[in-house]
Amino acid sequence: PLYSSAASDVYKRQLTAFVCDRDRILAVSGSGRRELTDRSISQPLEKLMEARKPYQSPGTPEKTLLPCEGAPRVLLCAAPVLAGGDVTGAVGLLTEDRAACPEDAQCKAVAVAAAFLAKQMEE
């Protein structure tokens, strides 16, 4: 419920949104929900979370990252969920356009959703 709500809020920006924990994609809003929900996250996404920094696609197709193996969409932007000083997951936006660069508003929406989830988990 909490994860689905956060994914829905980000999805209103007309992209596929997801929320994951450190192992699996927990919630997806937008196209690809069935393909992505409950799949194991990719190693690059895991490394992004461990870095504890937001991610923005560089807009070059050969440098795109997948949220899980074989995903039809790539990461546009993502932010780690940091609760109590620990990385508990991430929130992100996905796109089919491998050359897309995220807008500032999209990155901020993802960061706000991640901060919101972190606050909810701490309470």
Predicted feature residues:
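Single conserved hydrophobic/aromatic residue that forms the stacking wall/gate
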Residues: 1-3, 7, 11
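Short N-terminal helix-loop-first-beta-strand/juxtamembrane motif that initiates sensory/input modules
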Residues: 9-25
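Regulatory sensory and allosteric helical modules in signal-transduction proteins
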Residues: 22, 34-68
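Short amphipathic alpha-helical signal-transduction/dimerization elements
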Residues: 53, 111-122
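A short beta-strand signature within small-molecule sensing/ligand-binding domains used
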Residues: 70-80
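Short hydrophobic/glycine-rich mini-motifs in sensory/regulatory modules
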Residues: 81-91
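Regulatory loop-to-helix N-cap segments in sensory/regulatory domains
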Residues: 95-108, 120-123
